[in-house]
Amino acid sequence: MFKTFVGAFKNKDIRKKIIYTLLILVVVRVGSLLPIPGVDTNYFSSLLSGINTGDLSYLSAFTGGSFERMSLFALSITPYITSSIIMQLLTIAIPKLEEMQKEGEDGRKKIASITRYVTIGLSLIESIAMAVGFGRSGLIKDSAQLSTLHYVVCIIVVVAALTAGSAVLMWLGERITEKGVGNGISIVLLINIISGMPSDFATLYSTFVAPKTPAKGVLAAVIILAILIVMVVLVCFLQDGERRIPVQYSQKVSGRRTVGGQSTNIPLKVNTAGVMPIIFASSLMQFPVIIAQLFGKSYEWTRYLSSSYWCRVEAPKYSIGLLVYIVLLIIFAYFYTSITFNPIEVADNLKKAGGVIPGITPGKSTSEYLNKILNYIVFIGAVGLLIIALIPIMCTGFFNASVSFGGTSIIIIVGVVLETLKQIESQMCNRYYKGFLSE
């Protein structure tokens, strides 16, 4: 990894892209510290401090702490992520969008444009809900003393600032994709997660290391480090692990030449769905809890949905929520994989191109074979995701040490780093061959 970065900095063009990316990330972090005019950030922080941190940990990680501070980038890129998920689901339900997706680069540009508009719409809705819902309760400074007109103006300012902040982050992410290195949105999400890690490590230290004797403290630190390393290795396996299905193409005689006959493979990734099953399952379980707690309501049933209660030894009945979470994660793993990989479509394309999986009849038998292998691989990937997701949850329940970087964050960090390194290496190879051919 370090050799890749050293080699990249030796190349002038790639070095410029890396510096450009770093400068934009500085802008992102500065924007996350800029307060919104008229907002009492201290009040909002105190409001959130009364909420179980386990329920807002993923939101805190994705926004880099901007949500608690109610800064310019408080919504972060979560509206864009939600919009992308919505568009992926709509491509299945709406045939016109599915056709647009198959049009190649032009179709992808149209879908990207629609995604931007959906992002702005979602940002506006979320901003209005936050400003109006919490305005009179203290989010707006001195709201009780403000006139109706002045209060409405403050609401408009907050809504405009939050919506504009989300739009600016989306634009900055696209600039990184276009002129920098890596996927811009993923890079922004990565820096937000990393920015919250120092406080998380401080929490781990104060909970497991500081209260103990030096010998036990060192042992606890070694165990924590070992768990993190195991999680990273497991994520690397899930991200890069794949089952390759061999494919043989038939030979065709064109004049005096024999065309085709080459062998290739269909790579089926162990974790085809990526981090989406965890996000879907967590959001579905935590949304009712967050809404109830933000509005000052406390119900017994919310504890079954709250991850901070699932692994408490003194209250094992709440583990029912954990079982529901496990079932949801597995269901979403299969569901999202069915969106990204269609065995029937792949089998049909192979048949049209003259490709055959050795020992499998083209057509229906091929699709059934691919579906069988895919179901097996998805199950392995889902189990791996469960292990990664449950370790932080168990840490929260057994030891009451909630940290914002959970399994989702580790998957995103490792995935984005690997993807960015591969892109840098690819650009280095392209530069090398161009230089070689020009000599």
Residue ranges and their predicted role:
Residues 1-101, 106-439:
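N-terminal cationic and glycine-rich segments that engage phosphates or anionic surfaces
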